[in-house]
């Protein structure tokens, strides 16, 4: 709906980065309705690298936020704190762009 509203206002765009893979599927639907070629006319990137990325054609490029790694680290840190161990005050996790068919 939001992409249709932007289009109706005359706003043009060549890419969409969605906050979630399910929202990126909405961008795929928009592209089909507008007869846009993916990724030539419109590139689409989702977020979470969920199971949804393989359920569409073309398959969705997505940012993998490494949620499983984050959760494992959280449990290890929590167990360390509860056990009285000195734990790092800060840990940085980097996501990974998993390129598939919705980007060049």
Which residues does each PLM region occupy?
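Flexible loop/turn connectors
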Residues: 4-104
């Amino acid at each position: 709906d939001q992409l249709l509203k932007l289009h109706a206002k005359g706003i043009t765009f060549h890419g969409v980065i969605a906050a979630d893979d399910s929202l990126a599927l909405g961008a795929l639907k928009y592209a089909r309705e507008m007869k846009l070629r993916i990724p030539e006319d419109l590139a689409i990137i989702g977020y979470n690298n969920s199971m949804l990325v393989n359920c569409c054609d073309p398959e969705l490029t997505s940012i993998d936020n490494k949620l499983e790694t984050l959760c494992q680290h959280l449990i290890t840190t929590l167990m360390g704190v509860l056990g009285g161990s000195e734990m790092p005050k800060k840990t940085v996790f980097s996501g990974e762009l998993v390129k598939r068919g919705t980007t060049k």
